[in-house]
Amino acid sequence: MNSSLPTTSFPKNVNEIISETYDIYNSINDDNKTYANCLIMVLKKYHLWPNIKVKKFKNRSDIVLLHNNYKMGELYEYRELYEQCRSIVLDFTLSFNNNVVVTYANSIPVRVDINTYITNIYNDKDKCYEAYDGTMISVYNHNGEWHFGTSSCPDANSSKFSHPTKTHGNMFDEILYKYYGKQLTDHELSLTPNEVSKILRSKFVASLNPEMAYEFIIVHYENIHIIDYTNILGENYKELVHVNTKNRNTFVDEDIYTTRLQDYVEVGINYPKEFTNITDAIGYINSNPYSYGLIIKKKQDNSVKLYKISTEIINYREETDPCHPNTWMNILSVYMKNKQEYTIKDYISNYVPNIVLPIDNNGRYIDPTYLIHTLISTIKDSLYNYYVSTTTYFPKYGRYKMNKD
């Protein structure tokens, strides 16, 4: 008997996913059907979810953000499709093959070490820029409305990580206020935060072309991931870096320096430092403790491939520190990776040596590894008991079925 599992035939590209989404939508006789839910059905059918995810736009079920989880590492079954879904906005009200509002599939860099890049990838026509530690804000116009999102969230106002309450949209507005605040009238300053936000953003997009999509990096003192720029930008720093402009019709990246916006330069919006050769660039990041690394732009036919290079110190930090503001979330993440060469004790020793540990009923400190392991084991036992009590095994079919009674 052949006991091998059947192989899954995955969609070859995004268009095949879109086509099947239309098919499912048209086959459902339900007034409450949505393209977003039909798209999720397609992803689940091929077991692509949650490696590829769907985010809905507020009050719109026909426009979605399709993005991957950026964590798959080596993936062979559907790598090309996975790469296409790095971050792409789809509008299902448009005609087939015309659904892509904007794609950032080639805007998320692939991390490589310095030696690999020099030996296997380098070309003297590559363009090299300084990388910045922050959150990318994507700005584009669709149906006469400007949108501000991140690579995994349609609305920057709903996106947050480093700060418990302040969103990336809030930080973006604070930065815009630094640049445009003096242009506001007393009446405008007296308006609600949401109204002031709209005014600031309208000033910000006044110089932008609706046919283009733009990418900016938020560099904010409350959005620190690896690099704290206080020593070079000052206390409570708030900066915006314009890193890319893309033609939405051809998906071709513009040269960021030949197309830089003078209006932005005049108000203080930054552009990335450009290097004339890779030797100077590597020397710069090795000698500058506040450098996050390099972004390499390599032209490939009609597209641009991005690579990110950092020092070994930065690479080690990103590999070993999840950088979540909640230390215990980081400890849980380290535990889940289950690496023998890097444990919870190593994480605590490196990054939180003064952690305050919980105390048991006898007044003794609870070992963090024991605490997390006990927590996970308890959850596993509970899930197993729930599963056993709510399902029945059918030997004829070799599967479990949920008891709905």
Task: State each model region's role.
Residues 2-405:
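Core nucleotide-handling region used for phosphoryl-transfer chemistry
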